[in-house]
């Protein structure tokens, strides 16, 4: 019987003498978490990391700034006019190796040679999220099964790292943290003594403060996840803080909250389901188990709209620890193209549509923000309310459109078709003519002319069974062409978009002309037998309409009793299903802004978008 090989003789073993090798996928949070556990558990005397020795001083300065991120900049040895940027981010395993090593009082060795010309290695790895299911050991073994590319440059680079390791304390336990794609070249180089590599001094190394707006573009893991990892690493729990599906779910949910708050639109259940399916499919196409931030943004734009995609990207970029300015460092706003190669771009048209990729006009003002939380609330008076005139024009125009549409639909319902004899009446009925083509006869159509006009329009977006629209108000038209209006909505001053400017979402509204006649609909005892808000608006519409017809647009028609009430008042209800209206127009018309005084009207244009 043959003798079982010792661990030191096993080519697959990561324990070689006093060296323990911990291969990682650079920048990925799963490896950072596993590495921190290993360092805190084993407490090695030396931690060797795959970082250039020339960056040691500035790298330690960057670590001292954490959790605020930094970027190291040094000239490209092959082209001094170009710079190389190295982001120092919490989720990077090399960052975690140095941080945790210093915590356990280990000596930290920067073992990468200062040759200035790092070889380009294939950096395609299986999705690190699989570690949760198979463990880190099986992940590493599965990667090593397939031989990786070897070149003279890779061998020389590995030899330089091996030389640094061979010069460490031979009696101390050494934890070697290196990229997974360099593991086997370094293991081979450690089998024989190595010569000191050529050293190239870098002329100038600078530490920069990246602006918070650019973090999502320059970091490997998106900042939202980095922030959660910072909270996770102190206790290494709870695990769901950095579990990717849970992080993705929380990010999309928080982005949805901001989307509803900023636009007044509501995401439907089917959109959430499709969003989950879309992100899963995009991840599968990329060979990943969980979608990244780019795929999530693409899915958000495809399933919902550009506004939601913006909120997803903005939420992913949220990193509260990062400051927009630094007293000691220069602040830079970098792009992905300056850090990475083969970047992908996604254009989000959030505020200004750009047909045919036209340039945005010069002088386009950015949306104003509060200087500090609660600034606009302090400036809100709340003693009176009024509307925003440009929105009045839009909703009046929409009301006229609905009235024309209602009359047209009623006329269509009353039309009749007959064979052509002496007059084509209101035109040829193509459908009926084609249906009876074998007869060789023409059929014409006669529309029934509607006598009378529409005196009131009621539009119900939501019946509000859950009391999501508690704000009830009635306001009067300011001139002869502006309707009196009663509506229920979300509380506008709970969502301020400017000083004294509240943003709300209609649940439903009533419009009627002529103006200056309507008393408060919501406190009128004549309508108290209404079972809900839509019925109260319909009763008021029947009561205040000076014309025969009253338009009612909702998801379902009113109860039959309202037909009797309408007939008693010599009125007729014209019902239009809400689904028959253009969704884009509905979305636009549903947002309303309420101002706390007439003086705000001059300021509102700077805050509304």
Describe each PLM feature range.
Residues 1-609:
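Compositional signal for N-terminal targeting/processing segments
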């Amino acid at each position: 019987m043959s003798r079982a090989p010792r661990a030191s003789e096993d080519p697959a073993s990561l324990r070689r003498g006093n060296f323990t090798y911990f291969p990682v996928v650079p920048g990925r949070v799963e490896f950072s978490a596993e590495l921190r556990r290993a360092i805190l558990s084993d407490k090695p005397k030396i931690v060797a990391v795959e970082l250039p020795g020339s960056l040691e001083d500035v790298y330690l300065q960057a670590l001292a700034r954490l959790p605020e991120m930094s970027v190291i900049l040094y000239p490209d040895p092959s082209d001094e006019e170009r710079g190389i940027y190295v982001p120092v981010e919490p989720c990077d395993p090399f960052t975690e190796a140095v941080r945790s090593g210093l915590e356990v009082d280990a000596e930290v060795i920067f073992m990468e040679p200062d040759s200035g010309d790092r070889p380009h290695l294939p950096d395609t790895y299986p999705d690190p999220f699989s570690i949760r299911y198979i463990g880190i050991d099986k992940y590493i073994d599965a990667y090593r099964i397939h031989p990786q590319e070897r070149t003279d440059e890779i061998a020389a680079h590995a030899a330089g790292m091996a030389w640094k390791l061979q010069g460490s304390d031979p009696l101390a336990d050494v934890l070697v943290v290196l990229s997974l794609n360099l593991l086997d070249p370094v293991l081979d180089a450690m089998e024989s003594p190595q010569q000191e590599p050529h050293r190239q001094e870098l002329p100038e190394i600078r530490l920069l403060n990246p602006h918070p707006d650019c973090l999502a573009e320059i970091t490997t893991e998106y900042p939202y996840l980095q922030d959660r990892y910072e909270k996770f690493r102190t206790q290494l729990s709870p695990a769901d803080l950095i579990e990717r599906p849970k992080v993705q779910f929380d990010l999309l949910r928080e982005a949805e909250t901001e989307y509803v708050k900023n636009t007044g639109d509501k995401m439907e259940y089917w959109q959430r389901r499709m969003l989950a399916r879309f992100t899963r499919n995009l991840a599968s196409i990329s060979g990943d188990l969980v979608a990244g931030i780019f795929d999530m943004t693409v899915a958000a734009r495809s399933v919902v709209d550009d506004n939601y995609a913006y909120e997803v990207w903005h939420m992913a970029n949220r990193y509260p620890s990062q400051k927009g300015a630094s007293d000691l460092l220069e602040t830079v706003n970098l792009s992905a193209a300056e850090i990475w190669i083969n970047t992908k771009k996604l254009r989000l048209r959030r505020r200004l549509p750009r047909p045919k990729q036209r340039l945005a006009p010069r002088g386009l003002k950015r949306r104003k923000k509060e200087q500090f939380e609660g600034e606009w609330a302090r400036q809100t008076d709340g003693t009176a309310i009024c509307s925003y005139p440009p929105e009045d024009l839009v909703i009046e125009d929409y009301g006229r459109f609905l009235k024309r549409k209602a009359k047209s639909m009623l006329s269509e319902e009353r039309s009749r078709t007959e064979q052509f004899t002496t007059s084509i009446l209101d035109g040829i009925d193509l459908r009926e003519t084609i249906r009876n083509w074998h007869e060789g006869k023409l059929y014409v159509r006669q529309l029934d002319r509607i006598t009378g006009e529409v005196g009131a329009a009621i539009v119900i977006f939501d019946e509000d069974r859950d009391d999501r629209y508690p704000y009830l108000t009635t306001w009067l038209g300011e001139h002869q062409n502006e309707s009196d209006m009663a509506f229920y909505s979300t509380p506008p001053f709970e969502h301020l978009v400017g000083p004294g400017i509240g943003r709300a979402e209609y649940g439903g509204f009533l419009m009627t002309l002529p103006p200056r006649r309507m008393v408060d609909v919501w406190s009128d005892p004549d309508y108290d037998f209404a079972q809900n808000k839509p019925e109260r608006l319909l009763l008021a519409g029947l009561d205040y309409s000076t014309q025969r017809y009253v338009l009612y647009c909702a998801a379902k028609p009113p109860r039959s009793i309202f037909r009797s009430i309408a007939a008693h008042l010599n009125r007729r209800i014209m019902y239009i299903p809400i689904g028959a209206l253009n969704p884009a127009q509905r979305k636009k018309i549903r947002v309303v802004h309420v101002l706390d005084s007439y003086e705000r009207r001059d300021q509102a244009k700077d805050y509304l978008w």
